[in-house]
Amino acid sequence: METLFNGTLLVGGRDQDSTGFAWWAGNARLINLSGKLLGAHVAHAGLIVFWAGAMNLFEVAHFVPEKPMYEQGLILLPHLATLGWGVGPGGEVIDTFPYFVSGVLHLISSAVLGFGGVYHSLIGPETLEESFPFFGYVWKDKNKMTTILGIHLILLGAGALLLVGKAMYFGGVYDTWAPGGGDVRVITNPTGNPATIFGYLLKSPFGGEGWICSVDNMEDIIGGHLWIGFICIAGGIWHILTKPFAWARRALVWSGEAYLSYSLGAVSVMAFTACCFVWFNNTAYPSEFYGPTGPEASQAQAFTFLVRDQRLGANVGSAQGPTGLGKYLMRSPTGEIIFGGETMRFWDLRAPWLEPLRGPNGLDLNKLRNDIQPWQERRSAEYMTHAPLGSLNSVGGVATEINAVNYVSPRSWLSTSHFVLGFFFFVAHLWHAGRARAAAAGFEKGIERETEPALSMKPLN
């Protein structure tokens, strides 16, 4: 296979003739050089952690405590706040120092990783098998590959348990459902019941079911991490101690490109799940930091004008709108009292500022008349004008709303980016899976270059 006119281009001593890949194929040139591939991965990790630290400090430097996070284009500080750092009742930021510490720690870590990446890319051994057999591998060594899989699973399980530890023993996490409008809370009694935890997995992903994205309390979130932490660690130990069964050896393709395709497919699924989670879920992604969900902003508008007009003397229980349905309140098909108007489509929204006003049969008219608290009014008015809308030129908010702010919600950014990247990763999964299967079947010869017109043309220079 030939792509260069003269085939003489060398990059780092790894040329096309010796590897079968041109310079632009990147790490494909390192498939059989475990030491250099380690360097590439460690350097990549350094870049990732450097971005996290630098962006973290950038957000801290630009942060204005008097404005909500979601109005300031922040995507990292909301995550730190959700973990309970630097915030108090109602999600108010009371201390930015933990955010600064987080940024500095990531920057320092990135320097260590960067040094390791440069060392293994330029100085360390090209292959690890001879000097460090524990870290060496051959792609077709099925037992070694499942051992590496096991190590990864143990690390993932440990990561899940770190969140459990933070929530239960190290200061707690932010719970948007804490009474009075949210607060940092230690989760003392995480859900251990497997029927509850795995019931989420068995739910439909459609409609009001919402699969795992429907989780609506911190006990279930931390309990889920507890379960998944132990499952990942147990699975990791299993894969380290065992060899692949015969059916797995036959069914799977055992090559570097195949493992790449499996990984891309897994990340794609996680990206699509994250997209739905951040868009719909206001427990794992509290609206105090990420802005309201779409249904939440819509219901907030109905609630805000119900409050206003009720003060002006309207009978919100019986007033009719232009369609003859209830202007402020109506009944769902199953009889619950819900907000009227266009927001009826979001009647099953659950939000901490609204739930105290419900009774056994939907919204409670008596509570709406007598029990609405000022913090509920303020929060709904704020959410009403901060719907998670936005465009490519970063002009967000409701286009027809004169009180709206030009901003793009972090929910818009995070859900859109994860959807787009998840789609790209899915296409990459199909691409590399096809190549890996073709190579395993023995008919992947590359593109036929013998008759390519460009080969018979003069060089450009």
UniProtKB/Swiss-Prot annotation:
Task: Write down how the cofactor binds this protein.
Answer: Binds multiple chlorophylls and provides some of the ligands for the Ca-4Mn-5O cluster of the oxygen-evolving complex. It may also provide a ligand for a Cl- that is required for oxygen evolution. PSII binds additional chlorophylls, carotenoids and specific lipids.
What are the Phosphothreonine sites (modified residues) in this protein? 3
The entry describes its oligomerization and partners as: PSII is composed of 1 copy each of membrane proteins PsbA, PsbB, PsbC, PsbD, PsbE, PsbF, PsbH, PsbI, PsbJ, PsbK, PsbL, PsbM, PsbT, PsbX, PsbY, PsbZ, Psb30/Ycf12, at least 3 peripheral proteins of the oxygen-evolving complex and a large number of cofactors. It forms dimeric complexes.
Q: What is this protein called?
A: Photosystem II CP43 reaction center protein
Pfam families, A to Z: PSII (PF00421)
Q: Name one GO cellular component term.
A: photosystem II
Regarding the membrane, this protein is recorded as: Multi-pass membrane protein
The residues the record assigns to binding [CaMn4O5] cluster are 355
Q: Is the Transcription regulation keyword given for this protein?
A: no
Q: Name one GO molecular function term.
A: electron transporter, transferring electrons within the cyclic electron transport pathway of photosynthesis activity
Locations listed in the record: Plastid, Chloroplast thylakoid membrane
Q: Which InterPro entries match?
A: PS_antenna-like, PS_II_antenna-like_sf, PSII_PsbC, PSII_PsbC_sf
